[in-house]
A protein has these predicted regions:
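PRPP-associated nucleotide enzymes
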Residues: 1-98, 102-168
Length: 168
């Protein structure tokens, strides 16, 4: 996944695709969680002409006062933390969450809860890869570019274009 996430040509194109899904949402911020999702989120923010905000797994002293929440990982069920500087966002803003990979949706749900602390709305979720091996997600509405259907023992990965590319 790292070879894809840090390839500027691929991420630039993926950023165009995802930003086109949210162009009419009147977004104030693109938010992501450190670290692998940052290049994709940056491209989406750049295309939409809005600020990128990065939530951290642990608060950094250099960021000043922060808001920290606990959330449950959608796949492992483990309790995790997410922090965001109080200066990162204006209240009553509208944000989209962009990430590299969605397993169970726990991180997306955590972002939604974190944004509530800023009186801000999560108006969309976009990911590069949606892991379809996890059937029940903690979030219902999101877009993905590709779907991971299966990883076989022989290291063969079954990845297909997401439903946004298939005719209905």
């Amino acid at each position: 996944m790292t070879d894809v996430m840090y390839n500027p040509e691929i991420i630039s194109k993926a950023g165009v695709i995802l930003s086109s899904c949210f162009i009419d949402k009147k977004v104030d911020y693109v938010i992501t969680v450190e670290t692998k999702g940052i290049p994709l989120a940056y491209e989406v923010a750049r295309n939409l002409g809005v600020q990128l905000v990065i939530a951290r797994r642990a608060a950094q002293v250099t960021e000043g006062p922060t808001v920290t929440i606990n959330y449950v990982s959608g796949t492992s069920g483990r309790l995790q933390q997410m922090s965001l500087s109080k200066k990162s966002m204006k209240p009553t803003s509208r944000s989209i969450f962009i990430d590299d990979f969605m397993k169970g949706g726990g991180t997306a749900l955590g972002i939604k809860e974190l944004l509530k602390e800023f009186n801000s709305d999560l108006v969309g979720i976009g990911v590069l890869v949606d892991n379809k091996q996890v059937a029940k997600k903690l979030v219902d509405e999101y877009v993905s570019i590709v779907e991971l259907k299966a990883v076989k023992e022989s290291s063969v990965i079954d990845i297909r274009p997401s439903k946004m590319f298939t005719k209905k």
